[in-house]
Swiss-Prot record:
Record region (A): 1-329
Record family assignment: Belongs to the heat shock protein 90 family.
Gene Ontology, cellular component aspect: cytoplasm
Entry protein name: Chaperone protein HtpG
Length: 684
């Protein structure tokens, strides 16, 4: 006899709320319905094992089918089924009261839901205008019933014609969700959400190419692997098994470097396999490759908050029933089990890396370039991981040799300790662009390491804090004598006028570029040293590099690159430039320089007159005289600078020296490089 009733919820109509609330994630309805079918099947297996069901279990599988014409998706199982009383209890009361409770709890925190795991049967209404449940219990003498609801609080319950035990969920898809009537869409969702469920999931037949088109075969199309690699014992798996499982997860990826098999049952349940991929030099492209499962049911691939941030660079699967899924991320991060799981995974990762380093260092070194970004990220973001990684982190020198922290310190401290007792680690970030600086350091007996990774600027700053009496200096940040200061700087023997003259001469020929700023500096580097070279101050350059990954440091990222054009005042060519200016320009500057001297003497007298007086007490005549003096000085200095600039523009030696320095630092390109080549040919 047909029966009508009202669902026991307080909302007038909960279904529009369900649709609206979870609209962006409505595709998970299929996972929920199929998972329920798997649960029903597993319950039958359990009842059979304890003797409560003595009948033939037969072929235990879940079947999914799509009828595009009838606009239905049907999920069928041969599990425990339900009696009429159970339908009343579990669908009309428990399921929908749970729905209402769930929606009320998270109405203000919608974005915080991680997997929407456990939404259950009512998720079918996210895509359906009507849902039919046709079910028959495994119990003897049970009769089949059909429950129907069109999205209003009313339902009908009536006898049904169903010979076998189990349940059919028939979803009549509404117009807004017609996309789910495409077989390709459903197969894709099953492949994502149901790939490793514990009961075979069948979706149609396998196909083959025949007679010019794809045609069904007689073989069932089983979507899932019911016994994936992570559920097996490590002793039962070979390397090829792990690699094959990786290929099933990431078909287009390169082969992993190695892996960790997780298998914990106390004090929490955790299984899984984590793979170390070949990480490219870009953090952002690597994330969200770990898949989280709960008893082999896919939950999410967004595992931030469940594992430490740096571990999101790994690939693989984590399966745990002890991770709370329908909670906010802030709750996740404070959950005791999650903290324990997170710490355990970090420890296992560090254990695995240290094990390979100790037992097979050649292999570890061979794979270091692909591991380095991951290890650095972990060291920067997780203190406990840093403590472990300090044992196997490797520096790489310019010849490709690799050293641990202790090994490298032993190598360099004899010759690379400065006058203050600091061990100076020299490094380059561009093997070719900084070659000349690296060569100067090597010729002096220094070792230079290569730090050209995305996170290296941050690692350098971290290691300066962690390693005792250690300072990192890029090879192009100063002259070779000053990179590792063994003694005080040699005195530069130039007068103030000579300094000012050289500054003006070389500034006149420096490139004009808003993104680059050059400062002329002087060093006494000996007659055998280079005449001119370009350095880049360590602090500002490092801040700019770090700003690329830290939004809060954007101020540094917006500043122009700052370089020092260092003139070796002991070199004959610098002396030649200065001597040439004295012969060619200074005679015409004698009167102007004398005038400047007179103006400065007059300025000093005017300043003396102002001493001890308030601004209002200074005579107007004195103020006017001071202003006129400043104008005249600027005018006279301008005349001097104009003549020096003209001389510099016509002087090929100055241009050649600057371009040689730019070329040595990789800064001479385009038209300037072409002009340098033409000038070099003229000079030859």
């Amino acid at each position: 006899m047909s029966k009508k009733g009202t669902i026991g919820v307080t909302s007038d109509n909960i279904f529009p709320v369900i649709k609206k609330f979870l609209y962006s994630d409505h595709k998970i309805f299929l996972r929920e319905i199929v998972s329920n079918a798997v649960d029903a099947t597993q319950k039958l297996k359990t009842l059979t094992s304890v003797g409560e069901f003595k009948g033939e279990t037969g072929d235990l599988r879940v079947t999914v089918s799509v009828d595009e014409v009838a606009r239905t998706i049907t999920v069928s199982d041969r599990g425990v089924g339900m009696t009429e009383e159970e339908v009343e209890k579990y669908i009309n009361q428990i399921a929908f009261s749970s729905a209402e409770e769930f929606l009320e709890k998270y109405k203000d925190d919608k974005a915080a839901i991680i997997g929407h795991f456990g939404l259950g049967f009512y998720s079918a209404f996210m895509v359906s205008e009507r849902v039919d449940v046709i079910t028959r219990s495994f119990r003897e003498d049970a009769t089949a019933v059909k429950w129907s609801c069109d999205g209003s609080p009313e339902y009908t319950l009536e006898p049904a014609d169903k010979a076998d035990r189990g349940t059919d969920i028939v979803m009549h898809i509404d117009e807004e969700n017609s996309e789910f009537l495409k077989k390709e869409k459903i197969e894709g969702l099953l492949g994502k959400y149901c790939k490793f469920l514990t009961v075979p999931i069948i979706f149609g037949k396998k196909q083959e190419w025949k007679d010019g088109k794809m045609q069904d075969t007689d073989e069932d199309n089983q979507i899932n692997d019911t016994h994936p690699a992570w559920t097996k014992k490590p002793a039962d798996l070979k390397d090829e098994d792990y690699k094959e499982f990786y290929r099933s997860l990431y078909p287009m990826s390169e082969e992993p470097l190695f892996w960790i098999h997780l298998n914990v049952d106390y004090p929490f349940n955790l299984t899984g396999i984590l793979y170390f991929p070949k990480i490219k030099n870009n953090l952002d492209l690597q994330r969200n490759k770990i898949q989280l499962y709960c008893n082999q049911v896919y939950v999410t691939d967004e595992v931030q908050g469940i594992v430490p941030d740096f571990l999101t660079l790994l690939h693989g699967v984590i399966d745990s029933p002890d991770i709370p899924l329908n909670v906010s991320r802030s709750y996740l991060q404070s959950d005791a089990n999650v903290k324990k799981i997170s710490s355990h995974i970090t420890k296992k990762v560090a254990d695995r890396l240290e094990e390979i380093f100790k037992n097979d260092r050649p292999t570890f070194e061979e794979k270091w370039d692909s591991l380095k970004l991951f290890v650095e990220y972990g060291m920067l973001t997780d203190e406990k991981f840093y403590e472990r990684a300090a044992k196997f982190f490797l520096f790489t020198d310019m010849d490709g040799h690799k050293y641990t922290f202790d090994e490298y310190r032993t190598l360099v401290e004899g010759v690379q300790t400065d006058k203050d007792g600091q061990v100076v680690y020299l490094y380059a970030t561009d093997k070719h662009g900084q070659y000349s600086h690296v060569k100067r350091a090597s010729d002096k007996g220094y070792s230079v390491m290569l730090l050209d990774g995305q996170l290296d600027p941050h690692i350098v700053s971290l290691l300066e804090q962690k390693l005792e009496k250690t300072h990192f200096v890029r090879v192009d940040s100063d002259t070779i004598n000053n990179l590792i200061r063994k003694e005080e700087r040699a005195e530069v023997k130039l007068s103030d006028t000579e300094r000012a003259t050289l500054v003006k001469l070389f500034e006149a020929r420096l490139p004009r570029d808003e993104k680059k700023h050059f400062n002329v500096a002087f060093e006494s580097l000996g007659a055998e040293g280079e005449a001119i070279l370009i350095t880049q101050a360590e602090f500002m350059r490092r801040m700019r590099d770090m700003a690329q990954l830290q939004p809060g440091m954007s101020f540094y990222g917006e500043l122009p690159d700052s370089y020092n054009l260092v003139l070796n005042t002991d070199h004959p060519l610098i002396d030649k430039v200065l001597s040439g200016e004295k012969e060619s320009v200074e005679p015409s500057l004698t009167e102007l320089r004398a005038k400047i001297a007179e103006l400065k003497t007059e300025e000093a007298k005017l300043l003396d007159e102002e001493k001890g007086k308030k601004p209002e007490e200074i005579p107007v005549a004195t103020k006017e005289a001071k202003e006129n003096n400043a104008v005249e000085q600027a005018k006279t200095e301008g005349s001097i600078n104009d003549q020096l600039t003209k001389y510099a523009q016509d002087n090929e030696l100055i241009g050649q020296l600057i371009d040689l320095a730019l070329l040595g630092s990789g800064l001479l390109t385009g038209e300037a490089l072409a002009e340098f080549i033409r000038r070099s040919q003229r000079l030859l």
